[in-house]
Amino acid sequence: MENIQIDTNRIIGLYAPQNYGKSYFARHIINAISGHIPVFVYDTNFEADTNYASMKNVFAIHSVKKSEMETPAFFNKAILTLRAKQSNFYLVIEDIDKLIETSHKTKDTLEIFKLASDSRHQRIGIIYLTKEPSNIPVKLRSNTNLFLVGQFLEPTHLKYLGEMVDRKIIKTLKKPEFILFDRLTQVIQKVKIENNKMVEL
């Protein structure tokens, strides 16, 4: 099985159902990124300390209140502060759909869209995790370089994901397998974590 390497400064979307192992997979993606780039985790569920505790060079973005973490205002402030202090970093956003849902309700624009656009020209990488792929706006999806898709069975999500990957393949995946789709090369691979490495099946 071939060990999969991931280039730095890319935008990666992890699409998988609840309890499929997105955070587990994200940790191994971070390990696969070469160099010593600082990684900042934004987690509205306050689980970043648990999910990424053993990793070096990984820092959680915190608020005192969980409700505040789900607001676009706090997220935007955190990102602007981060950009002012760091020129080269990776940002991991757990359950980004929660932020997107709140931004739709409040009609507040999320700084993530500008960050995703700017990342092409700056040394910024993004890994976002979601269990609601059909809720990801086109302006974020269009800037995503690499997609990792877990098993989905819901027609709404399959219709959305079917534009990238064959729906039949998605339905046959078994936890914790993912389909890796590279938008730049149009290469599609089935991957999983084995012996602490991401490998092609």
Give names to the regions the model predicted.
Residues 17, 44, 64-66, 152:
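Structural motif
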Residues 59-83:
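Short glycine-rich substrate-engagement loop in P-loop NTPases that contacts/grips substrate
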Residues 17-59:
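Walker A/P-loop NTP-binding active-site region of P-loop NTPases
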Residues 9, 36-37, 87-88:
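Short coil/turn connectors at secondary-structure junctions
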